[in-house]
Curated annotation (Swiss-Prot):
Encoding gene, per UniProt annotation: gatB
Taxonomic placement: Bacteria, Bacillati, Cyanobacteriota, Cyanophyceae, Synechococcales
Subunit annotation: Heterotrimer of A, B and C subunits.
GO terms for biological process, alphabetical: glutaminyl-tRNAGln biosynthesis via transamidation; translation
Protein name as annotated: Aspartyl/glutamyl-tRNA(Asn/Gln) amidotransferase subunit B
Entries under InterPro entries matching the protein: Asn/Gln-tRNA_amidoTrfase_suB/E, Asn/Gln-tRNA_Trfase_suB/E_cat, Asn/Gln_amidotransferase, Asn/Gln_tRNA_amidoTrase-B-like, GatB, GatB_C_1, GatB_Yqey_C_2, Gln-tRNA_amidoTrfase_suB_CS
Function: Allows the formation of correctly charged Asn-tRNA(Asn) or Gln-tRNA(Gln) through the transamidation of misacylated Asp-tRNA(Asn) or Glu-tRNA(Gln) in organisms which lack either or both of asparaginyl-tRNA or glutaminyl-tRNA synthetases. The reaction takes place in the presence of glutamine and ATP through an activated phospho-Asp-tRNA(Asn) or phospho-Glu-tRNA(Gln).
């Protein structure tokens, strides 16, 4: 319990996350059985998955590569030598009654990532979150509780072992998180990094990324940690945030009313928006870890590490900084553009084709992203190719067409592709920038509205906006706005 001497201090939450990332290999971690999601239950099992007598596991080398690359992206130190251990526990989803994991010699330790936190009603801030370790392990099967609301009152349970033996990278953060929002942003950044690397799709709905939250509260930053509670069953970043916020309030209330906090595992109930007790929390000694006798030591040479490091892409945080510092984008635009690698790649291709970065960002984060999302497209499938968007941006930037005209032709370009310049030329949609042509239209407008002209010259100068509107209406929005205003000002003051 938090120290009594700290009662004058505000409560502070202490949060750490265990993030389980399914590595996107075609076969499982120790066997050639398929990892395809959504197939008939219990069709991707074999003697190794079930631990039948006489079978031996063999480490999938692609799993090792993906785990090391993930660790490098999280700035972890890669161990030259590590090993696998058996974690003993009895549960229906564990066919061997033990899980092959890594205990005291994981593949990587001691790293950190930078997280951008956007708290509602507050300024966005950067926070460095320490990462204790990343280790490899095999996933368990999946229990399906039938007959009622998940565990509560279910009449029977079914077990699907298709997931058993799928490769996991478990990423354990340090207890550096202080709010539910920070926890959600951290988990989101982990997924973003894994997707950039291509080592996992991070699909939370399919269980490709799952988070367990460890949370306690204390009186101020110098007080000892309180009793830690683990929370499971959160399948979205929003659920992570809400579960943390609920549990923080629950624990503070318990301490203030003298109710003991039990070290336990609790489930997040999305329907009721609360956490519920599931079981007492085991300690490491309960699992009776010992080195797996069927698997030899894991060795990653310096040459192999450097070879894999050379294959890493530019990561989200580095992109965000570059977009802001070198391209002059706002923090918001940099964040949106780097959220998914395909969008960032599309943006960079547009800028690489000569488009102004800020204008390109506006179009991509606005109309184009809306079209991609509403039609469930990938950027690779989008008919409007990056070089053609660059062409449209250059037409706008060069004063050849207005933003209004660009919006009019955009739906066709998004659906069919093609050249913006060709469409503009074919349909005569270019900006009217001939002073004589605009002057003739202005003379016509002034002659048609003598009362407004007299009122303007009598001091109602805001009427210039009326004339600009009439001019744009008459030209279909094609008159050069700057030139039109200059000519109108000159004519109205005569």
């Amino acid at each position: 319990m938090p120290a009594p001497a700290a009662k004058d201090q505000a409560w502070e939450a202490v949060i750490g996350l265990e993030t389980h990332v399914q590595l996107g290999t075609d076969s499982k971690i120790f066997t050639a059985a398929s990892t395809t999601f959504g197939d008939e239950p219990n069709t991707h099992i074999d003697p190794v998955v079930c631990g039948l007598p006489g079978t031996l596991p063999v480490l999938n080398q692609k799993v090792l590569e993906y785990a090391v690359k993930a660790a490098m992206a999280l700035n972890l130190n890669i161990a030259e030598h590590s090993k696998f251990d058996r974690k003993q526990y009895f549960y229906p989803d564990l066919p061997k009654n033990y899980q092959i994991s890594q205990y005291d010699e994981p593949i990587a330790e001691e790293g950190c990532i930078e997280v951008e936190v956007a708290e509602k009603g507050k300024d966005t801030y950067l926070k460095t979150i320490g990462i204790e370790r990343l280790h490899m392990e095999e996933d368990a099967g999946k229990l399906v509780h039938a007959g009622s609301d998940r565990l509560a009152g279910s009449t029977h349970s079914l077990v699907d072992y298709n997931r058993a033996g799928v490769a996991l990278a478990e990423i354990v953060s340090k207890p550096d998180l202080r709010t539910g929002r920070e926890a959600a942003e951290y988990a989101s950044e982990i997924r973003r990094i894994m997707r950039y690397l291509g080592v996992s799709d991070g699909n939370m709905q399919e269980g490709s990324l799952r988070c367990d939250v460890n949370i306690s509260v204390r009186r101020g930053p110098d007080a000892p940690f309180g009793t830690k509670v683990e929370i499971k069953n959160m399948n979205s970043f929003s659920a992570i945030q809400k579960a943390c916020e609920y549990e923080i309030k629950r624990q503070i209330k318990a301490y203030e009313t003298g109710e003991p906090i039990v070290q336990e595992t609790r489930l997040w109930d999305e329907g009721k928006q609360l956490t519920k007790s599931m079981r007492s929390k085991e300690g490491a000694s309960d699992y009776r870890y010992f080195p797996d006798p069927d698997l030899g030591p894991i060795e990653v040479s310096a040459d192999q590490r450097e070879s894999w490091r050379a294959e890493l892409p530019e990561l989200p945080a580095a992109k965000r900084h570059r977009y802001a510092d070198e391209l002059g984008l706002s923090q918001y635009d940099a964040r949106v553009l780097t959220d998914e690698r395909p969008m960032a790649d599309y943006f960079e291709a547009v800028v690489g084709a000569g488009a102004d970065a800020k204008l390109a960002a506006n179009w991509i984060t606005g109309d184009i992203a809306a079209h991609v999302n509403s039609n469930r497209l990938s950027y690779a499938e989008l008919p409007f190719r990056p070089e053609k968007l660059a062409e449209m941006v250059q037409l706008i930037d060069g004063g050849k067409i207005s933003g209004k005209i660009a919006k009019e032709i955009l739906p066709e370009l998004l659906e069919k592709g093609g050249s913006p310049k060709a469409i503009v030329d074919e349909r005569g949609l270019g900006i009217i920038s001939d002073p004589a042509a605009i002057e003739a239209i202005v003379d016509e407008l002034l002659g048609a509205h003598p009362d407004e002209v007299e009122a303007f010259r009598g001091g109602k100068t805001k009427l210039q906006g009326f004339f600009v509107g009439q001019l744009m209406k008459k030209t279909g929005g094609k008159a050069d706005p700057k030139l039109a205003n200059q000519i109108l000002s000159k004519k109205l003051k005569v």
